[in-house]
Structures are given as structure tokens and as C-alpha cells.
């Protein structure tokens, strides 16, 4: 017989989208650190698998999002041509691979999640608006709620904190007087999504 939690079991595919607010920090040796806000939108796809044990759900989930996350600090460095420039940090693709543990209240699933985050971090001065790119692997953790609203369809809202660790700006033409800087990028993501579960 079908129980109240059976509808969460199995593999699923979905779409997600949302907004991110965070910060980036540039540090060059013992020199003063530039910290500035970043923000942008995200949109992408999700794949996952749920394994319920009574009302407790264990799962794995991965997603890859196009991202417009970026930010800059004005007049933080000097280009090789001698012009003042902004230090800029960007991320144009963000992925995560996470575990999920949740509790199902019939159609409503409340969960916590955590795992790896990965994506390219672009760093450089603007002008000239050319960038070093470093692919980083960091971590992500958060929580969310998902509601099964029709058949195998569900909608979710979640919060994720993402830390992509420390990248670097090492090319003189891109980084000017900030060449050799280490650059961190952290984001607070709020996303919504729709999933379709395949019955097993």
C-alpha cells in the first residue's frame, strides 16, 4: 500500500533559479584588503535522488547554474598603463553536489543540505576588463522546504551559503598593481525550483 511518504522516493529532474548576495575580498601580501559586495542572478538545472525511510528522507542532489554574480571595488589598483582601476570578481557558472537529509510531513519536506561547490572565479581590473580565471572547488550548506503540489511535481525554496575558497590574480596585464592578490568569493543564495520525480 502507498504510504504518505512514498511520493518522495526515486530520481528527479528540475529547474531552479534565484538571486545571490555575497562578498569578495582581495588581499596582496600585507597591504590593505579590499572587501566589496557581489550580487547577481542564477538559473539552471537540477538532478537528484531521494530515499525515504518512513518520514525521514536521505538524498543526493546536484545542480549547475548559469550565474551573473559579480562585484567590484572602485579605484583599488593601478593598471600597467598607469590608470586607476576597480578590482572586479565574477562567477559565470556555479555547480553544487550535495547530500540532503529531510523530514516529510505528508506533502511538505523540510531539509538541510551540504556538500561541494565548484565554478570558475574570474579576477581582474576594470579597465581593462580582462580577467584571470581560476576553477575552484569549495563548499555549500543550507536548508529548504519542498512541497509536492500535483502528482510527481514539487516546488521548493532554499537558502545556500557558498564558499568558493581563494582564487588568485596573477597576470600583470589583467591585475596591474594588484598582481599576486589572493581573492575570496562567498555567496548567500536564495533559490526557488520545480522538480519532477520519476516513480520507482
Model-derived features: where do they sit?
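Gram-negative outer-membrane beta-barrel domains
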Residues: 1-200
Amino acid at each position: 500500500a502507498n504510504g504518505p511518504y512514498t511520493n518522495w522516493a526515486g530520481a528527479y529532474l528540475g529547474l531552479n533559479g534565484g538571486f545571490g548576495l555575497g562578498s569578495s575580498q582581495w588581499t596582496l601580501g600585507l597591504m590593505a584588503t579590499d572587501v566589496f559586495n557581489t550580487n547577481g542572478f542564477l538559473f539552471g538545472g537540477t538532478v537528484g535522488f531521494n530515499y525515504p525511510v518512513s518520514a525521514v528522507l536521505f538524498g543526493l542532489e546536484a545542480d549547475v547554474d548559469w550565474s551573473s554574480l559579480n562585484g567590484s571595488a572602485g579605484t583599488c589598483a593601478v593598471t600597467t598603463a598607469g590608470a586607476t582601476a576597480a578590482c572586479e570578481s565574477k562567477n559565470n557558472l556555479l555547480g553544487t553536489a550535495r547530500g540532503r537529509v529531510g523530514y516529510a510531513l505528508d506533502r511538505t519536506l523540510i531539509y538541510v543540505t551540504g556538500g561541494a561547490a565548484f565554478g570558475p572565479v574570474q579576477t581582474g581590473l576594470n579597465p581593462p576588463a580582462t580577467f584571470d580565471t581560476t576553477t575552484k572547488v569549495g563548499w555549500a550548506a543550507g536548508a529548504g522546504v519542498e512541497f509536492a503540489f500535483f502528482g510527481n511535481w514539487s516546488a521548493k525554496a532554499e537558502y545556500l551559503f557558498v564558499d568558493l575558497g581563494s582564487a588568485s590574480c596573477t597576470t600583470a596585464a589583467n591585475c596591474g598593481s594588484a598582481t599576486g592578490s589572493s581573492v575570496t568569493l562567498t555567496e548567500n543564495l536564495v533559490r526557488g525550483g520545480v522538480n519532477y520525480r520519476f516513480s520507482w
